[in-house]
Amino acid sequence: MKNLPGVFAFPDNETIFAHAYSQRELEAMLPARAGAQPHAFAYAAWPLSKHRWRGAFVCRQRGVLKLNLELDAGAFERVPRSEAERFEPEQSDARALMHRGADGTVMSFECYSFLRCRPGLELREAGLALLRGLVVGGNRMRIFSGVRRAGASAATSAGMLGNESPFERAPFASLRIDAQAALFRAWAARRPTVVTGGTGVGKTSQVPKLLLWFNYLFGGTEDLDVLAPARERPVVLSLPRVALVRMNGHALRRALGFDALEGSPVELRYGDLAPADANSSRSPFRLVVSTNQLTLGALFAHGTVILDEVHEHDQMADIMLAVLRVHRARVDSIVLMSATLEDDRERLQEFFPDAEFVHIPGSTRFEIRGVYVRNSSDPRDARAYDEEERRNVSAALSAHRPRAGRCGILFVASVAQCEDYARLLTREHPELGVYVVHGKTPNVDALLAEVYASARPCVLVSTPYLESSVTIRTVTHVYDTGRVFVPAPFGGRQMLISPAMRTQRRGRVGRVMPGTYVYFYDPARLAPIKRIDSEFLYNYIIYARHYGLVLPDDLYVQPSDLELLRRCEEYLDGFGLAPERLFELASTRYLRMVEYAKIYARGGARAEELNRFERDGVVTEDVLASIRALNLRARVLSARARRGQFLHTCEVAFGPYAGTRFLLANRRRLRGDIFMVTERSFVL
């Protein structure tokens, strides 16, 4: 089967609805059978065999052979399968849903189909007698759908996946039947699939539901035209941050009609999982929503791997791309998603030459108006440029302001800039509700609830945190400074965003209502950002050794400094830890400094205290003593007084990054050596 039969389309409750087919409808569809292709209903043999019929057996009740699943409260006897399989139908009663044999034996439609659906059955051979029971079983299992009919209701989708409530109505381009069919063709062919389409068409919110549905029906199969035992594995939606895992996981759970995670086909996976996010009912076909780090640690436990936001070049996601390319045969399907491939399309086509590009048309659901506010200062004069930008942002909030009860997002580069702009806007625009949102903001859901409840116009001042996979219900305006802070070993620098980031930021509006995108930078100055050249290279080495990759050839993005890569390899070798031990630690611990692996490898109380420090920020004397003993030194080279504190120029004195210089602010004048606790905190 290459094409998705319409009877198995996922109900969007907009144009496609759950539907139970009658025997008369089945008979009317028979002439549409095309040549040697199996009838659409024949493919119901897969989900029935995988789910409803698992563990089923034949019984005789009041003279009728039926499945134990069909029994009523009366007495019955179990019938050996070998005996029941001798039955051959002579007549069929479409009202009673029964076949009658030449000897007068009566068997239910579903029981007959159950007996005939054995491994090796070629579905193109399914005749009407077999199809009748597949339709009955499929109706009882609630796996069929169809285009809108008179009286169609969203309520009919309740129970399709064991859901208490109906599927949410989803008028998204990604759930149109042509988009479903295109995605299914690539998924069934096991070709790498790159899903593109503007923000708001439903990639993150809808495509995972489709793949869960396909996996539930047909996952784990080699050839859909020949019935065989299925090797079922879950679908994983892999995301770069915990906040996105929680937000999207719960949104998917609600969209599938479940009031809680427990008992649903959605599982969240991130470090230190909160009890409220646990789900003990792990169905084999489930949708796992996971951080990239945890996905990479158990990659081949999944049948379909969905990597979202590939344009972000999250380190773990880029490593995962390399592993999936080298070990294609160990997963069934690879699906990559991005709103924009401006910076990546050529490399993806080279990396996965047989990839299927599935474009979902429609940039956003609503119109977006662009407004350019020019900064006349020379960007090389940072102070003048910043001061004019602040004036421009304040003026734009007067000229282009959200209505009462709506909000805007102001994108800046760093947490410090968030706080600075929040103070400015609070002072100059007291009529606005001003909120700061970034990766370290506690309880973002509660903050957004406050924004939604506000009668005032609000502004969310944010780092790129709000750039991806987030729909804010009341947002109508984006104000974009065009800045991003790119971390680097022992520091980082502020840069202009890439074209892909511009597309993402612009796409925060136009999802739920018309929007305005106000930008304060010159788009002609934008260029792609090669993040690997601003990252520690240790994880690339650790995961490459575990998965048998050749460095740097197998990497999706290769570092520019290959000599640095070699020095990092030699440095890790000096730890005296086996590659598998390093992999275990990298995939289960934060390892904010790779040198922490030496403490974790020794185990004991010190390792547990270090784990609490990394996860919760709990600092003890023992933790500091353990880290200090690693001798991670930096030298203070010089200092100058600035705004009531000293700004020190320091130099890393250990490892492959020795000689890297960074700035350190402290109220005291420091001299000599300091000891690094993390790459951005120190003790004397």
Curated annotation (Swiss-Prot):
Residues 392-563 form the Helicase C-terminal domain. It is found in: Virion. Disulfide bonds: none annotated. Keywords: ATP-binding, Helicase, Hydrolase, Nucleotide-binding, Transcription, Virion. The keyword Transcription applies. It catalyses: ATP + H2O = ADP + phosphate + H(+). Its EC number is 3.6.4.13. A motif (DEXH box) lies at residues 308-311. ATP binds at G197, G198, T199, G200, V201, G202, K203, T204. Belongs to the DEAD box helicase family. DEAH subfamily. NTP-dependent helicase that catalyzes unidirectional unwinding of 3'tailed duplex RNAs and plays an important role during transcription of early mRNAs, presumably by preventing R-loop formation behind the elongating RNA polymerase. Might also play a role in the export of newly synthesized mRNA chains out of the core into the cytoplasm. Required for replication and propagation of viral particles. This is RNA helicase NPH-II. It comes from Molluscum contagiosum virus subtype 1 (MOCV). The lineage of its organism: Viruses, Varidnaviria, Bamfordvirae, Nucleocytoviricota, Pokkesviricetes. The gene is NPH2.
